[in-house]
Design a protein with these regions (language model features):
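C-terminal regulatory/oligomerization modules of transcriptional regulators
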Residues: 1-6, 25, 30-35, 39-44, ...
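Short amphipathic alpha-helical boundary/capping segments
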Residues: 7-14
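Alpha-helical hinge/cap motifs
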Residues: 15-16, 43
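Short, hydrophobic-biased segments on the C-terminal half of alpha helices
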Residues: 51-52
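Short, solvent-exposed coil/turn segments
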Residues: 4-7, 67-69
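Short, cationic-aromatic polyanion-contact patches
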Residues: 15, 65-86
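Pre-recognition alpha-helix immediately N-terminal to the DNA-recognition helix
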Residues: 20-22
Length: 119
C-alpha cells in the first residue's frame, strides 16, 4: 500500500509546535494569513508554508475573502485529527493503569505512616 506524502500526513503536520499553535488559534474562528502571522515571530511567507502543510493534511481549508477576493481566509477542519486521537487513545489505558498503581502505592505509604505515628 503506498504511503501518503509526508506533507499530507496529519501526524507530521501536528508534530510542529507552530502548526499546533495555528490550529489552536483557528479553533477560535476563521482568520486571514496576515492575522495568523501577527501571532508569530516569523514572516508571513513562513506562516503560509505552515498553512500549506496543514492544508495538504486537510486540517485547514482555504477560501478567498475580502472585498476583492484576494485575501486567503483559513478555517479549521479537524476531521483528520480523529486519526491522531484514535491512535493516542490506545495509550490512555497505559497511563490510567500507571496512575492507578501510583495511587495505590501512595495510599499504602500514607496508611503505614499513620500506623507508625499512632504507635
Amino acid at each position: 500500500m503506498p504511503r501518503p506524502a509526508a506533507h499530507a500526513d496529519p501526524f507530521l503536520a501536528v508534530a510542529d509546535p507552530t502548526r499546533r499553535a495555528i490550529l489552536d488559534r483557528l479553533r477560535a474562528g476563521d482568520a486571514p494569513v496576515a492575522q495568523l502571522a501577527a501571532n508569530f515571530d516569523m514572516t508571513r511567507p513562513a506562516v503560509s508554508r505552515h498553512l500549506r502543510v496543514l492544508r495538504d493534511a486537510r486540517l485547514v481549508r482555504e477560501r478567498r475573502g475580502g472585498g476583492d477576493g484576494r485575501q486567503r481566509i483559513y478555517q479549521l477542519t479537524p476531521g483528520p485529527l480523529r486519526d491522531v486521537a484514535r491512535w493516542a487513545e490506545q495509550y490512555d489505558a497505559f497511563w490510567q493503569d500507571g496512575l492507578a498503581r501510583l495511587k495505590r502505592h501512595v495510599e499504602r505509604g500514607t496508611r503505614r505512616g499513620r500506623e507508625e505515628r499512632e504507635r
